[in-house]
């Protein structure tokens, strides 16, 4: 098993020193993730590309998933690599691998070459293509729009026969840009905006303003953990939770109805700015889009921005909602967002779309800012990798089992893609598949006289979901950890 990783082209327009630094960071990121998830997989930096190889196909799917979801990679080539003696040896190797593919088909050979050789790329294409045409009678050469394109690369003394192309994520390697703090709510917008900055090379930390209790926080942690685990697990990332209910209560009591929405957003930004300052983070990220709600008009956004000296980034500012949802679907956060509880304790009957500075300041003069400072001081921060540990500590009554008791049902709560890649089958045991994001709505329809053992690959999601179900009054759930 061998993959050739092509870095994003923007990296190569940088200066030599920056290019080397970026590719070195990319190599390190790939190595960290692969070492955490697989065994005996080697990573090598070859200046203009990175090679990832192993002696077996045991971790093929895991490695391919890692490479196609790691920022900074333009494409991933799956190759068969070998040495060669001369042109004829190359032809014979290509014939052995491609004979069956081109039978009764039209084909063309496309070659790239780098290094010192006694032949050109065009001569290589002609020699190999002509040989294949003579050796496979049912095949014929067609230079434009053929059925099969045989792609080969000769690099110094190595022949790479390209078996498949896989599109990479693009962007810059994680850690090449400065850290950001994302104001995450778990909905469509904040998940996509966080992803876009991860893709661009920033370590994105997460700040959650809790307005809806533990169930909402569990859901948001799932989204943040998913984004980190899938796209940025080479980095150490913080998750900060701020209990904002006291702030909301103060706004409801002290602020005039029409100004509540903008004042709440200003409080969010003040608090996020304090958190960012504590961790020396220069910019905040939000999922706001222009005109989406009353607090997101240009006038109101300007009044919101002035309360902090941190740069506020809004990557979705001109996006339509359907565009945002499409990206959420592509990156895997749509199902989280669809089932995320929407909490907002500040709902104005007639929210202002064009706030006035003097009126906002007059309303905020009634607000007790000691409350805001207190909730920020009491904010809970954790390493995002410790979400599994926290869920276990928060719910010690959630039992974990290795053996399956009689009549128990195993609930495979992995996503459909994960379940398809590695179906869970246990002899003599009933296994049901309900994705984690449907548990909240479908678990109550199950036979509650039975015990259900929740299963996921790493035990993180199963613990969080077990905690959530127990909070909803279901005591017939355990975590299955074979």
From Swiss-Prot:
Residues annotated as catalytic: 456 (cysteine persulfide intermediate)
Disulfide bridge partners, by residue number: 344-456
Reactions performed catalytically: [ThiI sulfur-carrier protein]-S-sulfanyl-L-cysteine + a uridine in tRNA + 2 reduced [2Fe-2S]-[ferredoxin] + ATP + H(+) = [ThiI sulfur-carrier protein]-L-cysteine + a 4-thiouridine in tRNA + 2 oxidized [2Fe-2S]-[ferredoxin] + AMP + diphosphate; [ThiS sulfur-carrier protein]-C-terminal Gly-Gly-AMP + S-sulfanyl-L-cysteinyl-[cysteine desulfurase] + AH2 = [ThiS sulfur-carrier protein]-C-terminal-Gly-aminoethanethioate + L-cysteinyl-[cysteine desulfurase] + A + AMP + 2 H(+)
Domain THUMP, first and last residues per copy: 61-165
Biological processes, Gene Ontology terms: thiamine biosynthetic process; thiamine diphosphate biosynthetic process; thiazole biosynthetic process; tRNA 4-thiouridine biosynthesis
Domain Rhodanese: 404-482
Pfam families, per the entry: ThiI, ThiI_fer, THUMP
Keyword tRNA-binding: yes
EC number: 2.8.1.4
Key words of the record: ATP-binding, Cytoplasm, Disulfide bond, Nucleotide-binding, Redox-active center, RNA-binding, Thiamine biosynthesis, Transferase, tRNA-binding
A single GO cellular-component term on record: cytosol
GO molecular function annotations of the record: ATP binding; CCA tRNA nucleotidyltransferase activity; tRNA binding; tRNA-uracil-4 sulfurtransferase activity
Function: Catalyzes the ATP-dependent transfer of a sulfur to tRNA to produce 4-thiouridine in position 8 of tRNAs, which functions as a near-UV photosensor. Also catalyzes the transfer of sulfur to the sulfur carrier protein ThiS, forming ThiS-thiocarboxylate. This is a step in the synthesis of thiazole, in the thiamine biosynthesis pathway. The sulfur is donated as persulfide by IscS.
Recorded family membership: Belongs to the ThiI family.
Protein name in UniProt: tRNA sulfurtransferase
Source organism (scientific name): Vibrio vulnificus (strain CMCP6)
């Amino acid at each position: 098993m061998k993959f050739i990783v092509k870095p994003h082209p923007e990296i190569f327009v940088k200066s030599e020193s920056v290019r080397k630094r970026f590719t070195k960071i990319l190599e390190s990121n790939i190595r960290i993730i692969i070492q955490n998830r697989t065994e005996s997989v080697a990573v090598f930096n070859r200046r203009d590309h990175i090679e990832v190889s192993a002696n077996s196909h045991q971790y093929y799917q895991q490695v391919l998933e890692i490479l196609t979801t790691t920022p900074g990679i333009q494409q991933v080539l799956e190759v068969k690599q070998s040495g060669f003696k001369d042109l004829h040896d190359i032809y014979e190797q290509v014939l052995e691998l491609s004979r069956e593919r081109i039978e009764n088909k039209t084909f063309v050979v496309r070659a790239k070459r780098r290094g010192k050789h006694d032949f050109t790329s065009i001569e290589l294409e002609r020699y190999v293509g002509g040989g294949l045409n003579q050796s496979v009678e049912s095949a014929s050469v067609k230079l434009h729009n053929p059925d099969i394109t045989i792609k080969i690369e000769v690099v110094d003394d190595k022949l790479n026969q390209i078996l498949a192309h896989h599109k990479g994520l693009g962007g810059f390697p994680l850690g090449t840009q400065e850290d950001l703090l994302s104001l995450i709510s778990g909905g469509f917008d904040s998940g996509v905006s966080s992803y876009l900055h991860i893709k661009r090379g920033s370590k994105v930390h997460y700040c959650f303003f809790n307005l809806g209790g533990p169930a909402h926080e569990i859901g948001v942690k799932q989204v943040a953990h998913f984004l980190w685990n899938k796209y940025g697990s080479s980095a150490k990332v913080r998750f900060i939770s701020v209990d904002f209910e006291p702030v909301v209560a103060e706004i409801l009591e002290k602020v005039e109805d029409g100004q509540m929405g903008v004042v709440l957003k200003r409080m969010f930004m003040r608090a996020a700015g304090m958190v960012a300052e504590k961790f020396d983070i220069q910019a905040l990220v939000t999922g706001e889009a222009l005109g989406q709600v009353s607090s997101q008009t240009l006038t109101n956004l300007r009044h919101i921005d002035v309360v902090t000296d941190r740069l506020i980034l809004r990557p979705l500012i001109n996006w339509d909602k359907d565009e945002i949802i499409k990206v959420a679907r592509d990156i895997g956060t749509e199902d989280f967002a669809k089932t995320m509880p929407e909490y907002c304790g500040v709902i104005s009957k007639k929210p202002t779309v064009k706030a006035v500075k003097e009126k906002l300041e007059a309303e905020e003069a009634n607000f007790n800012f000691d409350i805001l400072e207190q909730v920020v001081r009491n904010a809970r921060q954790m390493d995002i990798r410790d979400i599994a540990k926290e869920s276990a500590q928060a719910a010690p009554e959630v039992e974990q089992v290795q053996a399956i008791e009689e009549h128990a049902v195993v609930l495979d709560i992995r996503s459909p893609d994960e379940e398809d890649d590695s179906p869970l089958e246990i002899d003599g045991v009933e296994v049901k598949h309900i994705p984690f994001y449907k548990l909240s709505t479908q678990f109550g329809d199950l036979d509650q006289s039975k015990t259900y053992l929740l299963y996921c690959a790493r035990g993180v999601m199963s613990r969080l979901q077990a905690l959530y179900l127990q909070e909803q009054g279901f005591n017939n759930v355990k975590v299955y950890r074979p």
